[in-house]
Amino acid sequence: TNELAQARESLARRLQGVDPTDFAALRKAYDAYAENDPLPEMSTMSEIDLGGVSCLGLLPKGCSGDHVILWAHGGGFAMGSSRSHKGLASQVAAAAKVAAIVPDYRLAPEHQHPAALEDIVITYHAILGEGVQPNRIILAGDSAGGGLAVAAAMKLKEQGAAMPAGMILLSPWVDLANRGWSHTSKAQRDPFLTTAVLDTRAKQYGGEANANLSILDADLRGLPPAFIQT
């Protein structure tokens, strides 16, 4: 669509001339690309600390905050932040009439697996510690963040912790080995990503054993129900 083409061109302009190994510059450009995303009317938007993890708290106007979406942002495990995803998270939160919390989890390649996963799980437990009931929490995420949301639910199951009410997963990255047929059949149609880029990000996040982290191969029984949009 024209909108996708414009978005791709805008991001390409932001990244033009940026050294692909300079992650500080890449992240700055990525955040700047999304900084003007429209925001719904907010009661509060504040930086908060939950269990030692820096987060952005988003409370749409008219919401009490006793229901929470915990949003794991996308960005290939190496980019993205609460700033780049505040527009997306706040739009979903406003539509659902709940609060949203977006953690700034540790990023690869400086911090490989399981750092990001640990930060999401820590944030979840901290939200419980604030008195929010588990049946009023949704784990959510887009792209790599969608994979992290599922991985966090798996870790909570392993811990025997109280499970969230459900999950919202937008194009979740669940196969770090990138084995799907669409990597070939739709190679020229994805507006942003290539398989080569995904392979690089997977190795930066999980090292040479990154394929073993693929949620696609995991036992997902006992996880909360999920809404998946691709």
Enumerate the language-model features and the residues they cover.
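A glycine/proline-hinged amphipathic helix-loop "lid/cap" segment
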Residues: 1-61
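Proline/glycine-enriched tight loop/beta-turn segments at coil->beta junctions
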Residues: 60-68, 221-223
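Short beta-strand element of the alpha/beta-hydrolase
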Residues: 66-76
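Catalytic nucleophile-loop/oxyanion-hole region of alpha/beta-hydrolase
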Residues: 81-82, 88, 103-136
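Short beta-strand immediately N-terminal to the catalytic nucleophile in serine-hydrolase-like folds
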Residues: 139-141, 170, 229
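Gly/Ala-rich beta-loop-alpha elbow adjacent to hydrolase catalytic centers
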Residues: 141, 145, 149
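Hydrolase active-site cap/lid region
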Residues: 154-208
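Serine-hydrolase catalytic core
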Residues: 206-230
